[in-house]
Amino acid sequence: MAETNPELSDLMAQTNKKIVPKFTEIFPVEDVNYPYSAFIASVRKDVIKHCTDHKGIFQPVLPPEKKVPELWFYTELKTRTSSITLAIRMDNLYLVGFRTPGGVWWELARPATPTSSATTPGGSASAAGTRTSSATRVWRPSPWAARDDQGRQRPGEEEEDGDTGGGGGADADADAGGAELAAAAAAADPQADTKSKLVKLVVMVCEGLRFNTLSRTVDAGFNSQHGVTLTVTQGKQVQKWDRISKAAFEWADHPTAVIPDMQKLGIKDKNEAARIVALVKNQTTAAAAAATAASADNDDDEA
């Protein structure tokens, strides 16, 4: 029986619509004069150009989410011998695809829906921006593997099948997406310290953009042989970025509101939230959808 064609992934959809990244930020990981902190600050600055100010919220607010995102950016992590490119949605800072040193795009296939990335409290961070249930999460080679950023086939390049050289296939389980990224990073450079830096960057870039506290932690431990370890509180905050963003909108309307969920995260008010979180996820789309649903329910009751 012929296999049903899957729904277009975000990467394929943006290419079909001729949507190109708004910018590409290159990070030469071996350049001691361009530290991780400078890289994250530069990417944030470019993202903020597409953000909006919201009355009562201190942080820039990301663009509203769309089913097929139209705002993207790439970050290219380079060594002297190779590079890895990450495709990141600007409306929610989710990592949904990456290009290996061999030029193969791997993407998070639908129907998986990316949510906030997960970090084990007190442990090292896991795959950034791509947390979904093990039943739905699938990494697969993109059919657009050998195309450039404008969707054109690169001369002389063939699209690849199979894995990234890390021993894992396309149908990865909940943890294998991060393993594929790590394998790609390891292939980029044989030097152990550079491999470590690449893996940490691949894991941390999305959360590093979202969180002031996390990016400072990563920067402080960037050259550590032991990797970067988050506190229990930091891990919980990373898991609740969506909820912290929602709280920022609540505080905008009710500045003195006591929000129990935030107190559990060690965030007592909007000032504390602004110290911890650098960029807020837009809640206006969700609010509009909720209002529409409520209106429909009222209409049904009146009918």
From Swiss-Prot:
GO biological process annotation, one example: defense response
**EC assignment:** 3.2.2.22
What tissue specificity is annotated for this entry?
Answer: Endosperm.
Give any Pfam family that matches: RIP
Q: Name one GO cellular component term.
A: cytoplasm
Enzyme superclass (EC): hydrolase
Q: Where in the cell is it found?
A: Cytoplasm
Listed A to Z, the keywords are: Cytoplasm, Hydrolase, Plant defense, Protein synthesis inhibitor, Toxin
Q: Where is the composition biased (Low complexity)?
A: 112-137
The answer to whether keyword Lyase applies is: no
Q: Which parts form a coiled-coil structure per UniProt?
A: none
Query: Is Cytoplasm a UniProt keyword of this protein?
Result: yes
- Assembly information from the UniProt record: Monomer.
Q: What is this protein's function per UniProt?
A: A possible regulatory factor for the synthesis of zeins, the major group of storage proteins.
Which family would the database say this protein is a member of?
Belongs to the ribosome-inactivating protein family. Type 1 RIP subfamily.
Give the protein's recorded name.
Albumin b-32
